C-alpha cells in the first residue's frame, strides 16, 4: 500500500520504486478487494470520475461512459451505489479497476455476484490483458475458473503455501482435477493439524 516506508532496501514493481514514486506506481495498478463496495452516496459515474481523477486519466468522460456501457450500467447512472444490487456494485468495482487499463491487477473473488454472461465477458478481457503483457494476481475459491485462467498458481491454507507451479505441474496425473489437487494437499494439511492437536491433548493428559 505504500503506507509503511522501508527502513532499508527498496521495492520495485513494474520497474517503479514504490517508496519514491507511489502515485506513478498506483497509476499502473488496479485492485478489486473481496468485500469492498463503492461509496454508498455516490452514483457509479461519480465514483468512476473520482477514481479516474486520482489516476490522472485523460479524456475521462469518454472512459467513464465506455465502462458504464461495457458493464450495462447506463440505466443506473443516476442511482446511488447503495441502491444497486450486489452484482451491479461488483460491476462498478471492476470498472474502477479496469478504467485506466493497468499493467498489474490484484483481484479477490472478482466474479462474485456476476451472472454468467459478465463472468465470461470479464474473463475474456482479463485474458486479453495478459496476452498484451499485463499481469494478474487472482485469489479465488472457484477452482474451475482458476484452472481456466491461470498459467501459474499457489495453493494456500492458513497463510501457508502448500504448493506452487503450473496447473500441469501440480497434478499427479492427467485425470486429476485442480479440485483433487486442493483436497489432496489441504486435506493432508488438515489431517496433520488434527493429528498434532490430538497428540498435544494426549501429552497434556
Give residue spans per PLM region:
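Conserved ABC transporter NBD signature motif
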Residues: 9-17, 24-25
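Conserved ABC ATPase "signature" region
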Residues: 49, 53-76
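Conserved ABC ATPase signature
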Residues: 80-84
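Conserved catalytic motifs of ABC-family nucleotide-binding domains
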Residues: 101
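Catalytic Walker B motif of ABC-type/P-loop ATPase nucleotide-binding domains
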Residues: 105-109
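ABC ATPase "signature
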Residues: 164-165
Amino acid at each position: 500500500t505504500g503506507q509503511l516506508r522501508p527502513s532499508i532496501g527498496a521495492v520495485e514493481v513494474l520497474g517503479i520504486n514504490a517508496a519514491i514514486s507511489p502515485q506513478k506506481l498506483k497509476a499502473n495498478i488496479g485492485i478489486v478487494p473481496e468485500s469492498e463496495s463503492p461509496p454508498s452516496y455516490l452514483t457509479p459515474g461519480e465514483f468512476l470520475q473520482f477514481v479516474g481523477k486520482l489516476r490522472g486519466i485523460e479524456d475521462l468522460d469518454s472512459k467513464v461512459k465506455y465502462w458504464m456501457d461495457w458493464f450495462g450500467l447506463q440505466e443506473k447512472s443516476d442511482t446511488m451505489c447503495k441502491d444497486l444490487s450486489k452484482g451491479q456494485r461488483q460491476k462498478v468495482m471492476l470498472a474502477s479497476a479496469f478504467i485506466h487499463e493497468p499493467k498489474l491487477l490484484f483481484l479477490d473473488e472478482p466474479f462474485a455476484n456476476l451472472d454468467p454472461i459478465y463472468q465470461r465477458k470479464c474473463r475474456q478481457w482479463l485474458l486479453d490483458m495478459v496476452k498484451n503483457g499485463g499481469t494478474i494476481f487472482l485469489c479465488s475459491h472457484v477452482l474451475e475458473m482458476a484452472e481456466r485462467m491461470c498459467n501459474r498458481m499457489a495453493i494456500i491454507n492458513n497463510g501457508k503455501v502448500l504448493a506452487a507451479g503450473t496447473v500441469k505441474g501440480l497434478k499427479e496425473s492427467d485425470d486429476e482435477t485442480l479440485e483433487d489437487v486442493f483436497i489432496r494437499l489441504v486435506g493432508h494439511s488438515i489431517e496433520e493439524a488434527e493429528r498434532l492437536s490430538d497428540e498435544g491433548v494426549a501429552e497434556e493428559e
